[in-house]
């Protein structure tokens, strides 16, 4: 196949070929469900939704796993603060996650494992690492302590981040903490603390406790996709230490590459500053959807390449909304024909070439605008159908054009149609002052009237 993907591990764009012919197995790190999803989560979910959609368009079967981390220090803290069980909190946040993802047009993954359902597999993997001399347990004052991974016993540590152990050690505190053999060693199993609630603890050969974050993903990926699979993805912030540690765990245990291709989506910035709660520029998906329709948000994310930084601002969202409106306006001119995509068509061929080169959505979106321009000129139902179908490859342009262009108005359609009829009556009686008043009143509410020989239509002002 002609698809090429940038591999973080090799730092190069490589021809993609799945290990099992015709079948792609992909694991993407999902959310830690202690709070509502934010824009960074939206960026990752949309990016890998586009990846799995294009793989399917390319004729491949896709098994897509996106996990849910439902046990974590932040989750425990939030549940205690709320006076609720961990399961109550995480169940509620998973429902909210699904609502946000559905709103953004994100297809559900094949599997969405929750970490707490795979604790036996995590303990088994820790046992394998212990037998291979890659894991050791510390001793605490009260007895059994944490189980840690011995980083220096794994030869390939640092290959994903491109850092040597000495470089990594230079960034750490010199003293050995919590009984670790080395400051770089990371926890596989956290021993329970007396202050923690009972639902944050599991029995194990190492004493009561809970799994570390990194072992969760290694165990779930192996259980659902096998010891080696095709694509491992996540945000750029996960490259180190999370994904580096996954490699150490899985490859240390099984002696084979965890994933053939490592993909990382870029960071999100807000008005060219890092998004953070302390700066007051931290937005949940729901806060953004209160201001902008979901397809505009999806389009805003997609028109930037997944590896590039994404800069959020109201001006950029406004521009995305107006740009998407231009595409829908073309589809509103002529009813799109329902036809299969002809990949020999010059527009379709350009679109495919863009997507086959590391999921090049900026160029693919540019093709959509060129195609929309041709639809505007030719009024071709076939080209309109192609525009809608190519947009569908990205999860865009599937709403009824008229409905999309009218969405978001303060007045409902019936009220606006009554005013349009009153304006038409005023014009018939040559009461042009009244006709102008109605037009201007609607314009003041963000409704633009468009007169044509076929009658008057309306849309929301850009």
Curated annotation (Swiss-Prot):
UniProt xrefs under InterPro entries: Cys-tRNA-ligase (IPR015803), Cys-tRNA-synt_Ia_DALR (IPR015273), Cys-tRNA/MSH_ligase (IPR024909), CysS_C (IPR056411), Rossmann-like_a/b/a_fold (IPR014729), tRNA-synt_1_cat_dom (IPR032678), tRNAsynth_Ia_anticodon-bd (IPR009080)
GO molecular function, one term: cysteine-tRNA ligase activity
Domain of life: Bacteria
Cited Gene3D superfamilies: Cysteine-tRNA ligase, C-terminal anti-codon recognition domain, HUPs
Motif segment ('HIGH' region): 31-41
Residues the record lists as binding Zn(2+): 29, 217, 242, 246
Catalytic activity as recorded in UniProt: tRNA(Cys) + L-cysteine + ATP = L-cysteinyl-tRNA(Cys) + AMP + diphosphate
Chief localization: cytoplasm
Binding locations of ATP: 277
Keywords: Aminoacyl-tRNA synthetase, ATP-binding, Cytoplasm, Ligase, Metal-binding, Nucleotide-binding, Protein biosynthesis, Zinc
Cofactor(s) essential for the protein: Zn(2+)
Chain positions of motif 'KMSKS' region: 274-278
GO CC entries: cytosol
Enzyme class: ligase
SUPFAM superfamilies from the UniProt entry: Anticodon-binding domain of a subclass of class I aminoacyl-tRNA synthetases (SSF47323), Nucleotidylyl transferase (SSF52374)
Biological process according to GO: cysteinyl-tRNA aminoacylation
EC number, UniProt record: 6.1.1.16
NCBIfam families noted in UniProt: cysS
Recorded family membership: Belongs to the class-I aminoacyl-tRNA synthetase family.
PANTHER family per UniProt: CYSTEINE--TRNA LIGASE, CYTOPLASMIC, CYSTEINYL-TRNA SYNTHETASE
Assembly description: Monomer.
Protein name: Cysteine--tRNA ligase
Lineage of producing organism: Bacteria, Pseudomonadati, Pseudomonadota, Betaproteobacteria, Burkholderiales
């Amino acid at each position: 196949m002609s698809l090429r993907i940038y591999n973080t591990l090799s730092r190069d764009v490589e021809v993609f070929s799945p290990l099992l012919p015709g079948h792609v197995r992909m694991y993407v790190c999902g959310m830690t469900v202690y709070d509502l999803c934010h824009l960074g989560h939206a960026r990752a979910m949309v990016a890998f939704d586009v990846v799995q959609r294009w793989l399917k368009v390319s004729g491949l079967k896709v098994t897509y796993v996106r996990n849910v981390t439902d046990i974590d220090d932040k989750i425990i803290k939030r549940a205690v603060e709320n006076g609720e069980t961990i399961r109550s909190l995480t169940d509620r946040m998973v429902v909210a996650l699904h609502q946000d993802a559905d709103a953004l047009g994100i297809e559900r993954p094949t599997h969405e494992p929750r970490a707490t359902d795979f604790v036996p597999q995590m303990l088994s993997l820790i046992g394998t690492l212990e037998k291979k001399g890659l894991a050791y347990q510390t001793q605490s004052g009260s007895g059994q302590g944490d189980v840690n991974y011995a980083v220096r016993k794994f030869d390939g540590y640092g290959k994903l981040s491109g850092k040597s152990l000495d470089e990594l050690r230079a960034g750490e505190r010199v003293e050995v903490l919590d009984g670790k053999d080395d400051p770089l060693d990371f926890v596989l199993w956290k021993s329970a603390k007396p202050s923690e609630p009972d639902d944050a603890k599991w029995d194990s050969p190492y004493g009561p406790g809970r799994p570390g974050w990194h072992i969760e993903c290694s165990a779930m990926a192996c259980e659902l996709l096998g010891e080696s699979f095709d694509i491992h993805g996540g945000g750029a912030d996960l490259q180190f230490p999370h994904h580096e540690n996954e490699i150490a765990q899985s490859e240390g245990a099984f002696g084979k590459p965890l994933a053939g291709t490592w993909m990382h989506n870029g960071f999100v910035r807000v008005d060219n500053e890092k998004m953070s709660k302390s700066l007051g520029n931290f937005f949940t998906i729901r806060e953004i959807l209160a201001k902008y329709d979901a397809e505009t948000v999806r389009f805003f994310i997609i028109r930037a390449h997944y590896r590039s930084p994404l800069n959020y601002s109201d001006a950029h969202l406004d521009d995305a909304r107006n740009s998407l409106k231009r595409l829908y306006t073309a589809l509103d001119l002529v009813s799109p024909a329902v036809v299969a995509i002809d990949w020999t068509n010059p527009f379709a061929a350009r679109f495919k070439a863009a997507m086959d080169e590391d999921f090049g959505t900026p160029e693919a979106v540019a093709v959509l605008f060129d195609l929309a321009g041709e639809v505007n000129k030719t009024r071709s139902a076939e080209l309109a159908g192609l525009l809608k179908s190519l947009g569908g490859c990205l999860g865009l342009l599937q709403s009824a054009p008229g409905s999309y262009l009218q969405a978001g108005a303060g007045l409902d359609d019936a009220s606006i149609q009554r005013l349009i009829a009153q304006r038409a009556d005023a014009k018939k009686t040559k009461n042009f002052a009244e006709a102008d008043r109605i037009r201007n009143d609607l314009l003041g509410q963000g409704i633009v009237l468009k007169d044509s020989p076929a009658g008057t239509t309306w849309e929301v002002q850009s």
